[in-house]
Amino acid sequence: MSASVTSSDGRGPASPTSSSTGASTNPATSGLAAALKGATLAFQHQQRTAAKGSDTAVPRPHGGSRVPTPGTGSVSTSTSRTVGGSNGARLAATLAAREHSPPTTSKNEASRVVTSTPSSSSSVGSAGRTNRQELHGQATGGSSQQQQQQQHVEERANDHAPSKRPAMRSRRPSLASLSSQAVDNSHSHPPTPASAKPSSEPKSVSWIAATLAATSIAPTTSLVAMFDGKQEEAETATKKKKKKKPRPASKTQHHQTLTSPSPTPSEGLSIENQCGTGGVPSVASGKSKVAPKPKPKPRRDISLSTVESIKSSTGAMGRDGKSSNQEQGETRNRNGDVRDKPSREGGKVTVTGAKDIVFEGTSERRSQQKVPATPRSVQSKQGVEVPTDKRPSTPPVSQHAQISETTIISPQPRRVVSTPRLESSPAVPKTYKTVTNPRPDNKPTIRKSSRVVSPSVDQSQTIRQSAETGLGDRHTSRNSTSSDETFVSASSSPSPRPQTPTKELERVRPRLDRANTSTSSRASRVSTPASVRSPASQTRPSPVLRPGTGLYSYSTGASPTPEMSLDSLTNAMIASNLASSRLTALTQTSLESPGLPPVPPPRRGHRHHHLPHPHLRHRTQSPPHARPLIPQRTADSLPVRTGPSRQTEHTQPASLLKTLRAPRSLSDDEDLRLQTHRHRKKHLGGKKHAHNEGARRRWRDEMTIRQRRRYEAVWASNRGLFLRPGFAFEHPENWQPLPPPDDSLGQVDLSRAWESPEADLVVNVVVRDIWSRSRLPVDELAEVWELVDRRKCGALDKQEFVVGMWLIDQRLRGRKIPTVVGEGVWESAMDRVLSVNVKAPKAHKGRTKGHLKGVF
């Protein structure tokens, strides 16, 4: 048989310190080899005894061969082993621990009560027996003694087989943390020479072999037993109690065994054999061998030291919020399937395959202490049935069997403080009560659609909040999506929503129309069929604040929940359409007639109706109720638009078509002539078809007095600018210019030429600036300049400037620029007084003659 010894975490060889406290003084290789040899001999003897057909209480499993598991680092064999915890390692451990125990009394029986604690994996009873074994180690030894011890252990294991497997899960830490604690305990309690002396004897070697075989089993319960932040407190409390109560030198090894990290093989047997469910001792029955030292039934009387150690070890476990009665329910994972739980049907124990246990929210330190899920002991396949007697033997130690191997003998503590729930926690029985009993408020339960996504971490927090506020009478478990998947209620009436979230939702909802929104929202909730609503809103009626918006909603994101009623949405859409249409109408009206609304079409027979009083035409004085008010953008942006409903006044259009009307003439005489021509009466007779030469418009070769006066005004305002004496005229040699006038009062413009011939001239730069305002091309302005500049001195006098202005005005009227300016134009531009012909009045001939005759 090949065997290998590794540490509990599978990383390397197990140190003697982590295996036992007795081997810490002599970690030699020969001792380990002897220990392995002793364990091998004990196990082979057990196989030979079972092959001979000896009557033992532990049956062989069907196909229960040991499969080596990588990662556990425990002793692996290819031969078959027994199922009820009686494998070779445990038999060797029990053989070494119980050989020299004295006849059982009430005190000794209480000392054998084993309770796994978070701070230590050893038991009080095994510690006492280990002390006694080491004290008598010098007088015993040999393989024959090991065979005798093995038979003795088989009898005790047969007598103390448990009638029911405890369902309490142990809270045992990993072996790595316990080994470090064992080193501290070995330093704090040094072994006496009496206890350290038999460590090299043959019995000590067998004890080391049993301990190594038991310690190499990976504690699967460490996956579930790791609790949040309570391990260090339990270890500290245990160390303080050991320091406060010193023991004599003969009991020093007993203290070391109490805190030893290596669980002895008798641990699992003693707890299962002596304790039933709830700490009640089970009565041994069935076939058993005649033992040389029969022991009476165990009692419930426990010594004071055992009770104190149990209280200190289960202090952290009591705060975890899990009682043993609640732990007996079915353990469900996320998918809802039942985890490994042995059930008795027809005298058979059915053990399903173990599954990996998953933690939620564990820290990094806890994940580092995880031990591989495959245990050291034999694991049964799924569906393997083990026949049992009336009193079933110990079931195979699987992953969940080791989880629930701890039982509290003391009265069950009350769990007050609850820690965060683990993923492997069983479902609350309250969930199943709602399946059989109808709900009081007749709420319809709808089968969940496949489109609904399983709740995330944020949604699980919402579930806890809804359970705490009491809005729902059903507790929703995190392990299952919903408990409504298994049934459909017979009630078909829609369930009303709670009023508390409705009021809270109405407070946050935007108040577009408060009355319509509050009324229609309640109606829409009642009228909405239950099949349309999201299932998450029924199981979690508490409102959830959306991160992006300021609104509360009941939806989980799978199906939309109407946050606003249909009436509110319709009102909002209509209001937006009206606002946009009104704004467009106002814009068009303001473009057509900025201050007035469009005029309705007039009636027939009232086309030429005129109001008698002009002050009545003002629309602001009309009654305001005659015409409805037109919506305005602001109060001050537009004038008041009120007036009578029917207005017969005709308003002049802003503009007419330019193709039907001639532009207004700039000259007054031309407009007057056109006006008189239009109102001239038509001739009744004469040449009807003859062309009237005088009626057509001609270009005139002279300017009117009105035109000349307008042009002279422009000349007067720009003459003499930028000119000095001697600019435009040649003076004689003895000519002296006049002194400039006195400008003490600031009445004279020094930029103009004073009294001199240059004062009546307009310089070329000024002429160009004035003529360029006509927007005629530069070449045409140059042609006009060449026609009027007769002196070629760079400046124009009064007559030249006036003729040039007239030519530009004629070009703007559409006439071409002539090649030569006529004499009539120059004469009309001269400043002269026209002669007036006054006719003498007509008189009677006689009277005139007589009168004249009388005068002369």
Swiss-Prot record:
Signal peptide: none annotated. Residues 255-275, 303-315, 396-410, 451-468, 478-488, 644-654 have a biased composition (Polar residues). Residues 1-204, 230-563, 589-672 are annotated as: Disordered. Residues 743-832 form the EH domain. Pfam families: EH (PF12763). Residues 12-42, 67-84, 111-130, 194-204, 517-535 have a biased composition (Low complexity). Keywords: Lipid metabolism. Residues 239-254, 603-620 have a biased composition (Basic residues). InterPro entries: EF-hand-dom_pair, EH_dom. Residues 152-162, 329-347, 503-514 have a biased composition (Basic and acidic residues). The keyword Lipid metabolism applies. One of its GO terms (biological process) is lipid metabolic process. GO terms for cellular component: cytoplasm. Positive regulator of phosphatidylinositol 4,5-bisphosphate turnover and negatively regulates signaling through the cell integrity pathway. Involved in rDNA silencing. Belongs to the IRS4 family. This is Increased rDNA silencing protein 4.
